[in-house]
């Protein structure tokens, strides 16, 4: 069976579970379960600490896992990113107290930086020629400045609310942009059919989240103009109607552009425009 690691807690956990459920996989029913076998789908799910997933995958103990790109980079393991998953977007930023004179990357020189991602931060500073002390903390790094342990912090920022509440402000360019991703062991062949099935299923969920099905009627004389507005993946499905002067069109369109596309189609001459949500797909 394909061994898959998923976060047992944290901001990536629930979206990861939901995505796997939408892809047809069985999840745990008891929060104390650490392992779930799904023989019908040929997988075994392991619920692990988010920080540890890349380590297990990199060492080949687990075949694939869902984690953050920042966690993968910080792990320094041999695990390979296989595909982005479209959730858990964040940036990794430096932050200093509001009243601090630290406002640029150069100001970090000689300072103390508290972070949970010490390898990521150390490598970034070395790359930019900055010498600073990195202090590893397992969490709540915002308190380190107030307690006098550090001069600034480096941490994941989603909304910035936690930093603002702690009297901190971000500065300099982000160290990196991150989102959830599927990673694989270097021991797992990229062409492994089990991985191919998982990839198709997850991509199908992503497509269902990002696209909708649009149906509309259009005069035959306006079909070309309408298709130019909604070209679809390969090509729209065009069917004749009882009224020989009209065709029915069915096409997939980006969910984020639905209202603009409906307006554009109406201007072209389309009528009876209907949008339907997708549950799953294989493209």
Curated annotation (Swiss-Prot):
Family, according to the entry, reads as follows: Belongs to the ATP phosphoribosyltransferase family. Long subfamily.
InterPro entries registered for this protein in UniProt: ATP-PRT_HisG_long, ATP_PRibTrfase_cat, ATP_PRibTrfase_CS, ATP_PRibTrfase_HisG, HisG_C, N-reg_PII-like_a/b, N-reg_PII/ATP_PRibTrfase_C
Q: Which organism is it from?
A: Bifidobacterium longum (strain DJO10A)
Top EC class per UniProt?
A: transferase
List the subcellular locations: Cytoplasm
- Its protein name is ATP phosphoribosyltransferase
Q: Which reaction does it catalyse?
A: 1-(5-phospho-beta-D-ribosyl)-ATP + diphosphate = 5-phospho-alpha-D-ribose 1-diphosphate + ATP
- The protein's Enzyme Commission number: 2.4.2.17
> Which UniProt keywords are present, listed alphabetically?
Amino-acid biosynthesis, ATP-binding, Cytoplasm, Glycosyltransferase, Histidine biosynthesis, Magnesium, Metal-binding, Nucleotide-binding, Transferase
Quote the PROSITE patterns the UniProt record gives.
ATP_P_PHORIBOSYLTR
Gene3D superfamilies registered for this protein in UniProt: 3.30.70.120, Periplasmic binding protein-like II
What does the entry give for GO biological process?
L-histidine biosynthetic process
Which pathway features in its UniProt record? Amino-acid biosynthesis; L-histidine biosynthesis; L-histidine from 5-phospho-alpha-D-ribose 1-diphosphate: step 1/9
Membrane-crossing residue ranges in chain numbering:
none
Instruction: Name any cofactors this protein relies on.
Output: Mg(2+)
Functional note = Catalyzes the condensation of ATP and 5-phosphoribose 1-diphosphate to form N'-(5'-phosphoribosyl)-ATP (PR-ATP). Has a crucial role in the pathway because the rate of histidine biosynthesis seems to be controlled primarily by regulation of HisG enzymatic activity.
| Modulation of this protein's activity | Feedback inhibited by histidine.
One GO term in the molecular function aspect is: ATP binding
> Cross-referenced Pfam families, in alphabetical order?
HisG (PF01634), HisG_C (PF08029)
- Predominant location: cytoplasm
The UniProt entry's GO CC annotations, sorted and at most eight, read: cytoplasm
Give the domain of life.
Bacteria
